[in-house]
Amino acid sequence: MFHFSRNSIDVFGLSIHYYGILIALGVLLGVLLAARRQKRLNLPPETGLDLALICLPVAVVCARAYYVIFEWSAYKDDLLSIFNLRRGGLSIYGGVLGGALAVFVYSRIKKRPFLSLADLAAPSLALGQAVGRWGNFFNQEAYGAAVTQPSRMHFPLAVFIDADQTWHYATFFYESAWCFLIVALLLLFERRRFFRKRGDVFFWYLILYGLERAAVEGLRTDSLYWGPVRVSQALSLLAVLAVCAVFARRRGRFGKWGLLCPLPALAALILVPTRLTGCLSPLALALYALTLLFAFLQYLPASSEQ
């Protein structure tokens, strides 16, 4: 009747992969969280479910398309494999871009503020990522470089990969833990009324996730590349830059220095390559933290606004 394996469970002969179960669980928890928050954002009670039904299919298609585009060599000889999602192959940034487009279209059709809808979606998205990342654990993917020090060969710092019988840095766990922290911070700051304007929850999601992804992506061995550039790192820094530009525009001429916010993170990518060490150095962590501090200072209102 039931048979459990490393990455799936067989129910009456039907194989159900844990990856899909965890993605579905992340979606469900995200929808429930949105349903609890929509009233606070002055949105109709059906908004959360509407966004889930409309955005999720678009996000999945775009997440898969994004991944396939950058891994075309693996699919060009077997096009039908593009539709096989049981072994993973979904890009979070592709899903975010597709979901954002769907939210924008929905906002135009329903005549609701796009940024309010984005604020509603952001914590739910982070929660879905936090849960869904555990699908990478069962699929044994999205891990980092091999661990050479015996003292680091234990979970959650590292994970044992069956394919090469080697311990690797558990980058999926790092991202999952950080995304849970993002959810907690966004909800805490929202409750404490730290966010002042429409779109702030979404913008801070982009900053917090963007910096984490830029840092952790450097540890991974399966990054998507465009030439020599890790695509996710480039998009992460562009997202941080875009948000800092929004903060700068809000503050007028006093905020233009905010455009320099991403520079420490960029310096971390260039000057402290994780490929050489396999892990983040204290200098790299300090530079990413400095970018976060700059963004926070840029977000604070100018003295004339206080």
Residue ranges and their predicted role:
Residues 1-306:
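A feature for loop-to-transmembrane-helix boundaries and adjacent hydrophobic helices
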